């Protein structure tokens, strides 16, 4: 049976003691709850494979068996913290939709489900047997009725618990200082990602914040006063480390629908209503879309079909309610593929090919007829041709968004140049109403002034669709602009396309004209017919000084255009040539770096997609919390950088953004999966060295090693690293240092696979189809190389050697160990990297690097190889090296006393009514208030004496 990837052990799961428990009161007693914070790995002496480290709510941190030696010390109480969710399932007791965590389904009653909390609180009939579903994809496990079974009370961090800062605390003095207690007021989920994974805590000073209790495997709190969290049936919880069996899944090839398919619902309303029960539900408005054509947006976890009918309307349908027709329908906008030879081949028997069709290649057209045999009549390039559906692709306007910007700019420039030429060539009557525009186009200030004096009412008359002020702004004629403004020209008057004079100044790259118009009070954020402001226009044209002038005068840098792109989105799309514009925009104080365009890309996503390193760095400096933000498909900035081979961007996200390198998208792919999938050889060592798990699996159960062996491109040779990507050369050098064939002998897939095996990837790991990397390495030479790399990794682990690359790991609190694995003999003397003396090197924890001698290690706070904070320094005999004494500082008692005095002083001068402003008015009784509060009072709020006089003070 295939294991369910979400049912495997993951950090963040909440656990209780299990059937093989033999560790006394480490959990605080039966019913104590803990969080899985670390997974065991091959070769580790304290946390070997199939073990976990648990942070108990009451503070102990210890490792336990999760299948190791056949024992299971723990039971899984809740997996909502890792994002487990059952879409379209409603708890029939508490009515929560999209049930989180394990699902409990009654075997007696029809379609009756409970969430974990309701099941454990004895909701529904106790004599009824239930099925347990660990995840949405796992097979049900039949359980005995709850009647007569013992229930164990839960204790730990629940609502009402008293807590202090815990092992993963990184929130400064939000709690009021070390050891200050707070009270848990709520347990909730983190946005839509996870459930019951954070606690809302109110501290002694009255402030309330949210802290992690399982979210991403972190625990910010320690329980000092337990609270009751309900009950659990020990016999009904799954053993941690024994994955649930996966339901038989239909392969993608046999799915009736795929993303992008055109579908219709042709059923009667009553039939559709019945079919929708349990498959997205029924809404009366769905009847309006019966018979209409929609597009398959996605397939849900349960196999239901999400259909989009227009820009705003999506419905979830039972797959049996939909009918799939031709790929394209009359009225669909399509693009003809651009490859001539391919089109000729595909057209055989489908309308055939003539040379007259060549202008249609790569062009966008519209389907005007669908023939019975599936061929399509398409209007394109002024003609109508019959095409095979294989020659067409669905046209998405967003694909050409950047092209549209450039095309519009060229069209604007071209049309303006033609208009100016026509104006200058005009030989109209001097008294013609549009003569003023001609004189401005010719730069004749004296004649323009004369016309303004004689005919001031003609100041806004148009010629060639433009006013004199618009032409002067485009040409940068500052003197004429001032004359026209003095004559009360319409500064915000638009042309036929909605462009104002400010737009024209931006189009003409005229920063001084821009400043003059802004000083005259023009609308800085006026939009044209494409929803673009002058700032959009200047950014799209790459005019740095105009952008600077607009930003200096307070233009709104957050307004979106027709594609929902802000000016910074457009600047990022322009590439490194617009770096100066990016710098100017990101320095604007009120810029919204969380802005999202119509494709769901935040600015950080967009910069990562385009590989704009400067923009990524600037955005992270403003809002580092966005580094792990996900799009609708689960992609983060690091996913996008990995997918598009932007190595520098990935480095910035990892080193400066401190992103989660093991984050998953909706297909459970990590950034390493994507880099390997796209054969981006240079990114693989970077991600692995940053701590990306080499054994993480996607929704198909494939690890990066499985994916690598499906890539067959020849490995690019990197002879000179000058100015190039050092990643491929780094990967090759590591392979060669291990005695493996070099670049001339391996394909990309084989080279990456060997590298991953050297870094600890499991060559025997089976995916959901039951295939391991060794099964995929069909070629004997590759199979032999892969086995050799795996053997080298095992030898290195057995010998206690360091990893071949500087693996970055986050430091963790000290862990008490229950389990010990025999270690190899201690290391011999080696050269210290600092003083170059031959000595026994000190082992740094947690990174496990040996780089310096004892004398040099004393003052080190970070490992010089991987820059990870050192929590322990161990001699070869296991004794700890004392760190150098810190410089003397003020006694802690003195610091706390001063802080207390400061708070008292602050309280004495703060208004007791609004508790916001300082006291500005003092009453005759000696008490006081701020001016707004004190003016409205008739009696003192403290002593209740009537107020006869108010004395204003200045603090």
From Swiss-Prot:
Post-translational modification: Ubiquitinated. Possibly via autoubiquitination.
Tissue specificity field: Expressed in skeletal muscle, and to a lesser extent in heart, brain and kidney.
GO molecular function, one term: ubiquitin protein ligase activity
Zn finger residue spans: RING-type: 832-867, 911-944
The keyword Metal-binding is annotated on this UniProt entry: yes
Keyword Nucleotide-binding annotated: no
Any matching Pfam family: ZZ
ANK repeats (start-end): 464-493, 497-526, 530-559, 563-595, 599-628, 633-663, 667-696, 700-728, 769-798
Induction text: Down-regulated in many primary skin melanomas. Treatment with a demethylating agent, 5'-aza-2-deoxycytidine, restores expression, suggesting that down-regulation is the result of methylation of the gene.
Cellular component aspect of the GO annotation: cytoplasm; cytosol; early endosome; plasma membrane; ubiquitin ligase complex
Annotated zinc fingers (ZZ-type), start-end: 86-138
EC category: transferase
Function: E3 ubiquitin-protein ligase that mediates ubiquitination of Delta receptors, which act as ligands of Notch proteins. Positively regulates the Delta-mediated Notch signaling by ubiquitinating the intracellular domain of Delta, leading to endocytosis of Delta receptors.
Protein name: E3 ubiquitin-protein ligase MIB2
Source species: Homo sapiens (Human)
Phylogenetic classification of the source organism: Eukaryota, Metazoa, Chordata, Craniata, Vertebrata
């Amino acid at each position: 049976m295939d294991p369910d990837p979400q049912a495997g052990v993951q950090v963040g799961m909440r656990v209780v003691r299990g059937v093989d428990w033999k560790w006394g009161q480490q959990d605080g007693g039966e019913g104590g709850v803990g969080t899985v914070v670390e997974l065991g790995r091959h070769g580790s002496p304290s946390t070997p494979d199939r073990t976990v480290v648990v942070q108990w709510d009451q503070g102990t941190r210890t490792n336990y068996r999760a299948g190791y030696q056949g024992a299971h010390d723990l039971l899984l109480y809740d997996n909502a913290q890792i994002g487990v969710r059952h879409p379209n399932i409603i708890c029939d007791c508490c009515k929560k939709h999209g049930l989180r965590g394990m699902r409990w389904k009654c075997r007696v009653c029809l379609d009756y489900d409970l969430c974990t909390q309701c099941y454990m609180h004895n909701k529904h009939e106790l004599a009824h047997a239930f099925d347990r579903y660990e995840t949405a994809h796992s097979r049900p496990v039949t359980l005995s009725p709850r009647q007569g079974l013992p229930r164990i009370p839960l204790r730990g961090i629940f609502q009402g618990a008293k807590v202090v800062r815990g092992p993963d605390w990184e929130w400064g003095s939000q709690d009021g200082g070390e050891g200050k207690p707070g009270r848990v007021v709520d347990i909730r989920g983190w946005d839509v990602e996870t459930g019951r994974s954070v606690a809302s805590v109110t501290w002694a000073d009255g402030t309330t914040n949210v802290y992690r209790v399982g979210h991403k495997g972190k625990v910010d709190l320690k329980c000092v006063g337990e609270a009751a969290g309900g009950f659990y049936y020990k016999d009904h919880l799954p053993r941690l480390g024994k994955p649930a069996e996966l339901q038989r899944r239909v392969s993608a090839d046999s799915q009736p629908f795929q993303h992008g398919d055109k579908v219709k619902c042709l059923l009667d309303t009553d039939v559709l209503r019945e079919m929708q029960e349990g498959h997205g539900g029924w809404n009366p408005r769905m009847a309006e879309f019966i018979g209409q054509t929609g597009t398959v947006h996605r397939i849900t976890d349960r196999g239901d079909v999400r259909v989009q009918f227009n820009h705003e309307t999506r419905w979830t349908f039972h797959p049996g309610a939909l009918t799939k027709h031709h790929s394209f329908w009359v009225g669909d906008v399509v693009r003809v593929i651009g490859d001539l030879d391919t089109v000729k081949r595909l057209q055989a028997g489908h309308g055939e090919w003539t040379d007259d069709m060549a202008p249609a290649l790569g062009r966008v057209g519209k389907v005007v007829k669908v023939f019975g045999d599936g061929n399509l009549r398409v209007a394109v390039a002024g003609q109508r041709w019959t095409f095979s559906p294989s020659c067409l692709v669905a046209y998405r306007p967003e694909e050409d968004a950047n092209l549209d910007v450039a095309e519009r700019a060229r069209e604007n420039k071209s049309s303006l140049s033609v208009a100016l030429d026509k104006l200058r060539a005009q030989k109209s009557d001097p008294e013609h109403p549009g003569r003023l525009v001609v004189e401005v186009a010719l730069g004749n200030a004296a004649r323009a002034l004369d016309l303004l004096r004689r005919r001031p009412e003609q100041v806004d008359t148009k010629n060639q669709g433009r006013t004199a002020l618009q032409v002067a702004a485009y040409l940068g004629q500052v003197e004429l602009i001032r004359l026209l403004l003095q004559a009360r020209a319409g500064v915000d008057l638009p042309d036929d396309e909605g462009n104002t004079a400010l737009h024209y100044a931006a189009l003409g790259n005229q920063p001084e004209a821009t400043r003059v118009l802004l000083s005259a009070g023009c609308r800085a954020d006026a939009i044209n017919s494409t929803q673009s402001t002058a700032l959009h226009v200047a950014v799209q044209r790459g005019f740095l000084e105009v952008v600077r002038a607009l930003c200096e005068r307070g233009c709104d840098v957050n307004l979106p255009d027709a594609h929902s792109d802000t000016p910074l989105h457009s600047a990022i799309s322009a590439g490194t040539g617009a770096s100066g514009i990016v710098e100017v925009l990101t320095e604007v104080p009120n810029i919204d770096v969380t802005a999202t365009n119509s494709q769901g890309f935040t600015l950080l996503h967009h910069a990562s997609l385009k590989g704009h390193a400067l923009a990524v760095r600037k955005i992270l400096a403003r809002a580092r919390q966005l580094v792990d933000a996900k799009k609708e498909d689960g992609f983060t900035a690091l996913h996008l950088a990995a997918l598009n081979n932007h190595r520098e961007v990935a480095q910035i996200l990892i080193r400066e953004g401190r992103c989660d390198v093991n984050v998953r998208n909706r297909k459970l792919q990590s950034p390493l999966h994507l880099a390997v999938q796209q054969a981006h050889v240079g990114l693989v060592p970077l991600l692995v060295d940053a701590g990306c798990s080499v054994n993480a699996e996607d929704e198909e159960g494939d690890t990066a090693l499985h994916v690598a062996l499906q890539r067959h491109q020849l490995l690019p040779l990197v002879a000179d690293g000058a100015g190039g990507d050092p990643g491929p050369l780094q990967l090759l050098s590591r392979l060669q240092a291990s005695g493996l064939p070099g670049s001339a002998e391996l394909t990309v897939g084989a080279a990456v696979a060997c590298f991953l095996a050297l870094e600890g990837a499991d060559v025997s790991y089976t995916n959901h189809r039951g295939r391991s990397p060794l099964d995929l390495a069909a070629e004997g030479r590759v199979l032999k190389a892969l086995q050799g790399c795996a053997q080298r990794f095992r030898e290195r682990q057995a010998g206690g050697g360091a990893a071949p690359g500087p693996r970055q790991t986050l430091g963790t609190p000290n862990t008490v160990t229950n389990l010990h694995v025999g270690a190899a003999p201690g290391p011999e003397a080696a050269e210290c990297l600092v003083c170059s003396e031959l000595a026994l090197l000190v082992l740094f924890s947690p990174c496990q690097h040996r780089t310096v001698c004892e004398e040099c290690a004393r003052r080190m706070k970070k490992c010089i190889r991987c820059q990870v904070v050192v929590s322990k320094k161990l001699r070869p005999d296991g004794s700890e090296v004392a760190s150098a004494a810190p410089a003397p500082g003020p006694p802690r008692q003195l610091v706390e006393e001063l802080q207390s005095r400061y708070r008292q002083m602050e309280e004495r001068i703060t208004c007791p009514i609004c508790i916001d402003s300082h006291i500005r008015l003092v009453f005759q009784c000696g008490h006081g208030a701020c001016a707004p509060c004190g003016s409205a009072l008739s009696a003192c709020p403290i002593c209740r004496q009537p107020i006869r006089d108010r004395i204003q003070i200045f603090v």
